[in-house]
Structures are given as structure tokens and as C-alpha cells.
Amino acid sequence: DVCSSDLNMTRNPYGIKIEINMSSGTSYVDNIMAYSPNTENLLGSHNFYPHRYTGLGYDHFVYCSEKFRKYNLNTMAFVNSHDATFGPWPTQDGLCSLEDHRDLEIATQVKHLVLTGLIDDISVGNAYASEAELAAMAEAFHAPYPSIKVDTEPEITEDERIALFDNLHSYRGDRSDYVLRSTMTRVYYKDRPFPAHTTRDIVRGDV
């Protein structure tokens, strides 16, 4: 049958890797693992999706990825270049695995995949990513800790800049679904002036 055939292929004498689809959400990988394959030669890869709104939803992505992660199999997903001009399909909506990633900067896509703890390898689905994108991708992938890109207001003060960028922020344990709270700066800089300015209603994404 198909599963025993895949098992035999993982035990090839040449070290050839056998890559199977991660995105379907079936028990295919469980059936293969029941035959005790050589897991050094068995890899999983998510699909990429060229049409807008056809990419994986996050919950399904996690569900599918965990099926492979529980066996400690190497996993891969695709991110989308915004400088690329072509892919395997005529449409040019990008070529990512997660639909949520389609319009995000490539570094943000990579950071998200890394933070899931579910993906080992990340590839660019469309061609060709720019040198700047590849550099940003590599920096995000190899970063010692996660970072958030912050676009500052022109009126930012020097004390605010120091509080934002000269610290390793830690996320409070009593976490919220709506905000990331880093509170030690109010201890470190309690004697610095932080006058109110650029006041307006806070919207999603504000710091």
C-alpha cells in the first residue's frame, strides 16, 4: 500500500529525503509512522497558496503541524516575497502557506513561524526575493530572541526612544489577549520625564 511504499522509500541507501504534504490534516503521517520509517529521511512540508483567501487558517495550520511535530519530524512552510514577480501560477497574490501572512513583511512572516515552535525550515514561495528581503528573513530566523518592529512618531522624545529600544523587554506573566505588557521600564526610568504628546485614541498595533 501507499504507506508501506513511503516507508520503503525512507529506507533508501542513498539518504534521499522523502517529503510529504503537511496541509491536508489527514492521518497519513500517522499511518506511515505505524510502519517505523527512517525518520531521518522523512520530512513534512506545508503547501503554498497563490490565490488570495485560499491559504491555510492559523488553527488548521497548528493542527496539521502538531501531527508532524509529535513525531519530531522536520517541518517546512512557505513565506511570501513582495518583491517577487512570478511563481508557478499566472496570478500574483503571493505564495505563502498561511493566509494571514499574505500582506505582511517577510521578516514578520518568519518571526511568526519561528514563534509557533512548529516549523524548522522556511522557504520563499515566489521568485525572486530581494537581497534586502533575504537579509531580513535570515536576521529574523536566527534572532536570539523575538523582536517587534516599531515605527516611531516624529515627535518621539529621546527618553522614549531609550525606553523603547535600549532594553530587552519581557512579557508579563499575567498575559492578555489584547496587549503585550512590558513594565520594567517604569522602574528603570521612574525619574525621567515622559510628557503626554501626540494624544489620540489607541488603535490595534499602537505602542
Where are these regions (language model features)?
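A generic, well-ordered mixed alpha/beta core segment in the N-terminal half of proteins
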Residues: D6-N31
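C-terminal functional modules
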Residues: D151-V207
